[in-house]
Amino acid sequence: MQNFNIIKKSDIEQTFRVAKVMSDFDVKIEHSNEQFNGCIELPEKWNIGLIVGASGTGKTTIAKEIFNDCFVNNFEYTHKSVIDDMPKNVSIDEIEKMFYSVGFGSVPSWLKPYNVLSNGEKMRVDLARALLEKDKICFDEFTSVVDRNVAQTACIAINKAIKKQNKQFIAISCHYDIIEWLQPDWIFDTNKMQMVFTIAHDQKKYLQSRVVGENNGTNLGNIII
């Protein structure tokens, strides 16, 4: 069980404009602080987890607090072909299999530099590299920069790749539609600051209850500022 109580403070300089706004709206420096508290209880055995919620609900902050050792930061791509940016201790056959496993199957694109790839291709390359380098991966903004068709294909490919290699993958996303495609073993919803389920067959029940809640105007927010 992972308990957290995170207070996020901002270093605000009290300039003339800042002081004027604070005075006009009766706002204090402390009001800019954010607090996130809750508990993530992971199953004994799992391969895929999902931290999901609206923007500003603390997804990345919480993930870095709990899964910082496996957080995937911006990779450095310096070669003219992305295949040469993969780990040096990995064979070409392993790289090719990994590219295919994450849905990066365009061989001509393997020969291109990272900066000319599409957003969807970049995401797949990042995933492939992370999987080649780590056994446990926490991936921020998962599917955030791709259309939903690409997101669906990527989720299905990632599910198969992670389970086949028996690795652990934590996706961080604001998109609830990936629950059905990614099929995570557990979900932490930052809108409610609680575990939603840890059993795969409860996913449909959760999605249905969420739609009903939104249609009824349920307030899902739970952030202290």
Please name every model-derived segment.
Residues 136, 164-170:
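Loop/turn-to-beta-strand initiation segments
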Residues 138-149:
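Walker B catalytic motif
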Residues 46, 109-114:
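Interfacial catalytic loop of ABC nucleotide-binding domains
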Residues 153-158:
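Conserved hydrophobic alpha-helix in the ABC-type ATPase nucleotide-binding domain
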